[in-house]
Amino acid sequence: MFFVRPLFSRISPLQRSISLNNVKKSKFDSSPITNGADYLRSLSGRNLKIYLFGKLVEDPLNHPMIRPSINAVAETYDLAARDPELASATSPMTGARVNRFLHIAQSSDDLVMQGKMQRRLGQLTGTCFQRCVGMDAINSLHSTTFDMDAKYNTTYHQRFLAWVTAMQQANFVLGGAMTDVKGDRSKAPHAQEDPDLFVHVTRRSDAGVWITGAKAHQTGCLNSHWLLVMPTIRLGEQDRDYAIVGAVPVDAEGITYIYGI
């Protein structure tokens, strides 16, 4: 679970243009991640506010309860290095080979290869390797933003493609923050006693949006570089502020992670 109270999303595929150089230099090392060892190094030195069983975690990278899940993600990089045919693909945006978890499927063969890669990673790790929701999210948002632009004459799709391209070139892990806390399941988000049971927009400006709320069951968020925050239920007109999809860095100011509940 993680809470966002409040968070200013400075860069979002649905709000702002994005610069690859700015992404790399502002948050992570300037070199793309190429293997599991690189990935582990990319997690060092982050300022994450994490609580595990009521205690603040000072070093999540080497915490004995967290490290096994990190090792599983590292294997997604090492498999791509050992078997690029299985775990990487050619990006239609850049023409370069990218990790298959960052690839937007172009054919039924791509989907078959996704399944084969996931099956192999399950055999190698024996656990969840935490990148499936992020992969599914960029694939669904690819078509959703395209349809939105066609209907509303917006520019979401090109902004989204620019962000995905930046993620591919840096070879980042994308966490999919989808599951809501929900609260009273008989009520819509806007009718909840606590509005923060669902992530929602609290302020908008030309610079971006401010969001607040909670998501649940996001173990892989700690092991990601960026989060795609998405709603998970059907929303009505009164839930407009809850209909937000955006990308935020894992170590963005204002995020609190509650791990292990």
Predicted regions and their residues:
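FAD-binding core of flavoproteins
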Residues: 181-261
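Glycine-rich loop at the start of a catalytic domain that most often binds anionic cofactors/ligands
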Residues: 62-67, 96-102, 190-192
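General beta-strand structural signal in soluble alpha/beta enzymes
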Residues: 52, 175-178, 210-212
